Amino acid sequence: MTWHPHANRLKTFLLLVGMSAMIVFFGALFGRTALILAVLFAVGMNVYVYFNSDKLALRAMHAQPVSELQAPAMYRIVRELATSAHQPMPRLYISDTAAPNAFATGRNPRNAAVCCTTGILALLNERELRAVLGHELSHVYNRDILISCIAGALASVITALANMAMWAGMFGGNRDGQNPFALLLVSLLGPIAATVVRMAVSRSREYQADESGAVLTGDPLALASALRKISGGVQLAPLPPEPQLASQAHLMIANPFRAGERIGSLFSTHPPIEDRIRRLEQMARG
């Protein structure tokens, strides 16, 4: 079984550098004061999300904590995987929904939570469930919540500066030699570009979690099988496309919405299931 984590890490790094470059560009348009205000706003908002990510996600999914008596298989699998990775045991939750999915959240391994829906517990066999839980634990061990918040903070700065560009374009006229039409164009394209890059970061982290989760369990084909089942199950029982659920979609192991209910692949939080399965099958072949 081969594993090449460096490509995904490099891609994530380059995407974050690209977002930082966009901020420098916007900062050059508006000067230091506007840049500092935008950065302070974005950092403050995302620090809150970072420290409360578990509460926000669990509340959105109406997840309830479960004991070992209530979910013995889930506890046994997670304990085995955490022990093999020399990591603490996370809190375990179940969300009572037929939509087959799972997610992990929490800012570090000591504050982590893993949640499975009743739909995924009914759909998968134990080998596949182990693979899914390995994927979710890998998100925690790879510090993907932190990476997501960094990407979110950068995107928020770009959006805030783009809003300034919009107002400057509409009401600033030609002051300081600024072209109002150029400012309006930047204000439209900036947030779109930031969102595209942020979603690309999310997709890159999914590939990374697939690979590192498969290494943790030693069974990439089980994860491929689970993803195939989950993809079909989501078409039958998707999550409702509500705003509070859409904001947590990037945490799920697979896109929780039925195909066609969300925007195209550039704006998708997850890579195509077919690509993920193909990569896992290649890992298994070595």
From Swiss-Prot:
InterPro entries: HtpX_protease, Pept_M48_protease_HtpX, Peptidase_M48. The keyword Protein biosynthesis does not apply. It is a multi-pass membrane protein. It comes from the Bacteria. It holds the Pfam family Peptidase_M48. Binds 1 zinc ion per subunit. Its EC number is 3.4.24.-. GO terms for biological process: proteolysis. One of its GO terms (molecular function) is metalloendopeptidase activity. The active site is at E136. Zn(2+) binds at H135, H139, E206. Its main location: membrane. It is found in: Cell membrane. One of its GO terms (cellular component) is plasma membrane. It is an enzyme of class 3 (hydrolase). The chain crosses the membrane at residues 13-30, 34-51, 145-165, 181-201. Its cofactor is Zn(2+). Belongs to the peptidase M48B family. This is Protease HtpX homolog.
